[in-house]
Amino acid sequence: MTIDEMMSAIKGMTVIELSELVKALEKEFGVSAAVAVAAPAAGGAAVAAAAEEEKTEFNVILKDVGANKINVIKAVRELTSLGLKEAKDMVEAAPKAVKENVSKEEADAAKKALEAAGATIEIK
């Protein structure tokens, strides 16, 4: 069997079959499929920067309300579908996460809307 044939066979397997294959390989060869954790080398900063670029989920943090609290509350209500009291409590509790684990596009849109209302926003 060639490598290409093995790859084709593996591609056709279900997740359960792949899991069983990994377990069988671990048992047969006495190895572990766990990822080894190593300390970053001198280029660790570059690796950290690359990992930061690959981030897919972001949190929109309300840092400061600014002078126009009412507009910020309205913007929070539109973005989160919260009631008036919940949105007011969130705004008054700043710094506070307004949206969590959202896409880059959604985080940018939320930041734009909240900054237009007068708030200071941070995306993490």
UniProtKB/Swiss-Prot annotation:
Keyword hit for Metal-binding: no
Cellular component annotations (GO), alphabetically ordered: cytosolic large ribosomal subunit
Pfam assignment, any one: Ribosomal_L12_N
GO molecular function terms attached to this record: mRNA binding; structural constituent of ribosome
Alphabetical UniProt keywords: Ribonucleoprotein, Ribosomal protein
Domain of life: Bacteria
Keyword Ribosomal protein recorded: yes
InterPro entries recorded: Ribosomal_bL12 (IPR000206), Ribosomal_bL12_C (IPR013823), Ribosomal_bL12_C/ClpS-like (IPR014719), Ribosomal_bL12_oligo (IPR008932), Ribosomal_bL12_oligo_N_sf (IPR036235)
GO-annotated biological processes: translation
Disulphide bridges: none
Family classification: Belongs to the bacterial ribosomal protein bL12 family.
Family matches, as NCBIfam families: L12 (TIGR00855)
Subunit structure and binding partners: Homodimer. Part of the ribosomal stalk of the 50S ribosomal subunit. Forms a multimeric L10(L12)X complex, where L10 forms an elongated spine to which 2 to 4 L12 dimers bind in a sequential fashion. Binds GTP-bound translation factors.
Function: Forms part of the ribosomal stalk which helps the ribosome interact with GTP-bound translation factors. Is thus essential for accurate translation.
Protein name per UniProt: Large ribosomal subunit protein bL12
Organism: Dehalococcoides mccartyi (strain ATCC BAA-2266 / KCTC 15142 / 195)
